[in-house]
């Protein structure tokens, strides 16, 4: 592939609902442009972008993949992103690196939650968008219904530029509303044909002349001169229509709609032409605001003669070829062996080998100019790092990822593999910023947090398939606590005689409730009943004892212990004896002081569609939650519900919320405090966790 300057490069993310045809569209674009010599199929497991074992097995995208093609004067980098919500982090990376987003919408199932998620993410990042209606060769496809949905859901910015002509429920041709020409497809090639009659248009549910007028109206809104020309009754030239749509996409006031069939390739050539004519290159859209070492904002334009600056938007941890860093160059040019500054960490290193990708195929490149996307091999950089020339050290804002909220305990199937798991998870967390792996000190379990069940399965599969370590997962234990409800005074006496020196320690301790999580120890011994040198032993005995309560072996909180009396033997008393005496007093005192189990309560903030608020309130009541309030969310049509919910009731909440809201709901949940466990649940918890005396 020849070298392209920044005005001739386009970076396009393909996003949308799972199953809406993203990978098939990528395959069709690559094949129709001549970048590949065969049309792969997802069912056959031979597409360019879904090439990992996990993707072939699941028959869906799990990772954002990079491929490229040439159309007209342009090089186009395609970023095929997953549509499954469990892999949303990959979509964040792909859309962040793009200059424009093609959002696929199935002609059969129409606008779905994933359509909104892709659109919202693109708009949040300031990316121009285009809807591509796919699967129009399906007998149940209905373009008119989809177009009506798009206009209703996304407003007046929606502007069709290519529409199908339908007769007897079959597509007979496509109308390009910019060219005002119709094309039919014969043996995969577009042949100009007659425009549909008014009678045909009426039967389709949309009038072609009305749609052409709508395109002109949309273009008129992009420029004052065009506005005046439109209302004077003059027709726009084709160039004015193209320039107007291009400008409207850049400013966000036009979202074109086109349509294709990725299986018979009809409409794909027109989409390539639209990519060529309508979508912005990096030189127009990719000016970035960075931050200097002094914290000052600086604008970085896409100019090749400027000092190099680039952003690492994705990392792949490959145990065989090493770390692969996906990099978007924002200014200057990146070359192998170039010494660069990592503005995020302050370190300096040399750039290694650079490649571009066609799916899994690596193609060496001599340099990457501004606006281009390239993969650097074996660089010591991470996702969200900025690398730059020392002549201008600038750092770009990091991407924001969804927080992992589906938690499972993980343990090695094979004894001794724990260190292998930690090493592998370190690599995977470099690659995927939506997973977390850490020790829960309260239960001594290693907890793996992901975005959902599928995401968890993928991580477990990677551990086994890529790193050779198998794990088992289970619902995390709940970190209950124990405390007391009344003040008691008890004796703890340890006496043992077995020839020679014996063991003797005797203490009287008052135990009472307090508000501290840690044990509070005091001594109020008079007359030397217990020598001062044994006080630390008594405290140590208690500190070790409170790690296990008498009900179910959970740590004890809210306990104050006061050493008030005791006795000793001048020969047989020792630190160990007093430590044992304290332990005996602790056990007896806990039994007498009305011990109680405490459960952790968390603070929940959950956002659901307005239509789901009643269902969610009912669900929270079932889970013993206390609703604290409801607030209208910033996003239209969503409501925030704030509640306190026991952590024991939250194990499957991620999956429940996704099912209830079709993936629209999001939540945060943080531990708040401990409360007494309801009496009807105590026996079950004790039975499952009972500790021998």
Q: What are these model-predicted stretches?
A:
Residues 1-693:
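Structural and coupling elements of P-loop NTPases
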């Amino acid at each position: 592939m020849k070298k392209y300057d920044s005005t001739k490069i386009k970076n396009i993310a393909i996003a949308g609902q799972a199953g809406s045809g993203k990978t098939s569209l990528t395959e069709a674009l690559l094949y129709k442009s001549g970048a590949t010599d065969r049309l792969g199929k997802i069912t056959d497991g031979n597409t360019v972008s879904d090439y990992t074992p996990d993707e072939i097995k699941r028959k869906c995208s799990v990772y954002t993949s990079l491929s490229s093609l040439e159309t007209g004067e342009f090089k186009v980098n395609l970023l095929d992103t997953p549509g499954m919500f469990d892999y949303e982090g990959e979509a964040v990376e792909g859309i962040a690196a793009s200059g424009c987003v093609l959002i696929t919408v199935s002609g059969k199932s129409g606008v779905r939650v994933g359509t909104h998620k892709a659109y919202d993410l693109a708009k949040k990042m300031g990316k121009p968008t285009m809807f591509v209606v796919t699967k129009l060769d399906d007998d149940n496809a209905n373009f008119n219904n989809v177009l009506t949905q798009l206009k209703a859901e996304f407003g007046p910015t929606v502007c069709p530029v290519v529409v199908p002509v339908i007769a007897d429920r079959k597509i007979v041709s496509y109308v390009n509303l910019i060219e005002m020409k119709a094309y039919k497809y014969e043996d995969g090639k577009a042949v100009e044909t007659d425009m549909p009659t008014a009678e045909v248009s009426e039967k389709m549910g949309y009038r072609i002349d009305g749609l052409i007028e709508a395109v002109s109206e949309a273009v008129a809104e992009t420029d004052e001169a065009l506005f005046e020309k439109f209302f004077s009754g003059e027709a726009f030239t084709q160039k004015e229509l193209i320039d107007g749509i291009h400008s409207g996409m850049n400013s966000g006031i036009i979202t074109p709609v086109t349509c294709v069939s990725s299986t018979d390739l009809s409409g794909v050539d027109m989409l390539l032409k639209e990519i060529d004519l309508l979508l912005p290159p990096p030189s127009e859209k990719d000016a970035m605001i960075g931050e200097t070492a002094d914290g000052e904002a600086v604008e970085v334009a896409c100019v090749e003669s400027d000092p190099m600056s680039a952003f690492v938007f994705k990392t792949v941890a490959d145990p065989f070829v090493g770390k692969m860093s996906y990099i978007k160059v924002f200014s200057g040019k990146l070359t192998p062996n170039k010494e660069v500054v990592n503005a995020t960490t302050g370190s300096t290193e040399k750039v290694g080998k650079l490649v571009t990708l066609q799916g899994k195929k690596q193609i060496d490149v001599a340099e990457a100019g501004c606006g281009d996307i390239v993969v650097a091999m074996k660089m010591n950089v991470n996702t969200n790092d900025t690398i730059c020339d020392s002549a201008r050290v600038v750092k770009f804002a990091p991407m924001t990822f969804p927080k992992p909220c589906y938690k499972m305990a993980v343990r090695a199937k094979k004894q001794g593999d724990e260190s292998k798991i930690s090493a592998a998870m370190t690599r995977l967390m470099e690659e995927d910023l939506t997973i977390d792996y850490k020790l829960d000190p309260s239960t001594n379990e290693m907890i793996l947090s992901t975005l959902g069940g599928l995401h968890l399965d993928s991580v477990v599969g990677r551990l086994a398939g890529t790193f050779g370590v198998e794990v088992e997962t289970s619902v995390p234990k709940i970190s209950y606590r124990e405390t007391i409800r009344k003040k008691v005074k008890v004796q703890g006496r340890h006496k043992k005689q077995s020839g020679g020196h014996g063991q003797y320690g005797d203490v009287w301790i008052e135990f009472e409730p307090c508000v501290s999580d840690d044990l509070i120890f005091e001594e109020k011994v008079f007359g030397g009943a217990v020598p001062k040198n044994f006080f630390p032993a008594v405290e140590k005995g208690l500190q070790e004892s409170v790690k296990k309560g008498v009900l179910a072996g959970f740590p004890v909180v809210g306990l104050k212990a006061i050493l008030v009396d005791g006795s000793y033997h001048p020969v047989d008393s020792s630190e160990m004896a007093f430590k044992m005496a304290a332990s005996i007093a602790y056990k007896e005192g806990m039994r007498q002081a009305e011990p109680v189990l405490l459960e952790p309560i968390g603070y929940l903030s959950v956002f659901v569609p307005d239509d789901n608020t009643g269902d969610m309130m009912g669900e929270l009541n079932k889970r013993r939650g206390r609703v604290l309030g409801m607030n209208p969310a910033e996003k239209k049509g969503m409501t925030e519900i704030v509640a306190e919910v026991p952590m024991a009731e939250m194990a499957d909440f991620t999956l429940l919320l996704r099912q209830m809201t079709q993936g629209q709901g999001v939540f945060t949940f943080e531990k708040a405090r401990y409360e007494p466990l309801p009496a009807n649940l105590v026996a079950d918890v004790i039975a499952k966790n009972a500790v021998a005396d």
